[in-house]
């Protein structure tokens, strides 16, 4: 008798065949990778095909692979990863799709397929700059309206570009260039024979 994962894998291969770039198993779940051009077609069939039945998308997140594998990775930089759930079949699936352009990452929106991804796509846009074409309201959701850049990108500076403070003279919040100075952190070495009551 085939396991649930083997059954799911066989159903995926029967439904998609050559559309799947890869199928891997990790942590008791399958991950499939598809091209951006096939993304909408695959997502629709994942939901509508009764042998798959992924009626829920429980999460969508952006990923920046710029420094993946200590810089040895040379594939596309940005991806969206969806976590899908089939209640009727009691199985889960990860769907990964890479944006073909690293400079302006664009992927189709799947809001029309799973409306739960609305705010997830907005979050991935806000934090990674992934543009979801066809999204009904793609605007920032976590950062401030005038925020510059996308803070979860690997090349975004830790201190940011601007800081916000209240100006008592102007009686309003103002933005200014970051005034935090870069620091070198030097480890503190304690050279005491009996530090903390311990014998050495």
From Swiss-Prot:
It is a peripheral membrane protein. It comes from the Bacteria. One of its GO terms (molecular function) is NADH:ubiquinone reductase (non-electrogenic) activity. It holds the Pfam family Complex1_30kDa. InterPro entries: NADH_DH_suC, NADH_quin_OxRdtase_su_C/D-like, NADH_UbQ_OxRdtase_30kDa_su, NADH_UbQ_OxRdtase_CS. Its main location: membrane. NDH-1 is composed of 14 different subunits. Subunits NuoB, C, D, E, F, and G constitute the peripheral sector of the complex. Belongs to the complex I 30 kDa subunit family. This is NADH-quinone oxidoreductase subunit C. It comes from Paraburkholderia xenovorans (strain LB400).
């Amino acid at each position: 008798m085939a396991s649930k994962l083997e059954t799911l894998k066989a159903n995926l291969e029967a439904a998609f065949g050559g559309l799947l770039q890869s199928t891997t198993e990790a942590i008791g779940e399958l991950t499939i990778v598809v091209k951006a051009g096939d993304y909408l077609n695959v997502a629709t069939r994942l939901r509508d095909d009764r042998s798959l039945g992924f009626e829920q998308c429980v999460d969508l997140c952006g990923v920046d692979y710029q420094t993946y594998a200590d810089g040895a990775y040379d594939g596309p930089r940005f991806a969206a990863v969806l976590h899908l759930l089939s209640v009727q079949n009691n199985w889960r699936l990860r769907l990964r799709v890479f944006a073909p352009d690293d400079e302006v990452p664009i992927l189709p929106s799947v809001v029309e397929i799973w409306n739960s991804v609305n705010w997830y796509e907005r979050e991935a846009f806000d934090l990674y700059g992934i543009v979801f074409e066809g999204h009904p309201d793609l605007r920032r959701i976590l950062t401030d309206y005038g925020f510059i850049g996308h803070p979860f990108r690997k090349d975004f500076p830790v201190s940011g570009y601007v800081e916000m403070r209240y100006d008592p003279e102007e009686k309003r919040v103002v933005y200014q260039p970051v005034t935090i100075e870069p620091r070198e952190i030097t480890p503190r070495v304690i050279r005491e024979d009996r530090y903390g009551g311990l014998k050495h």
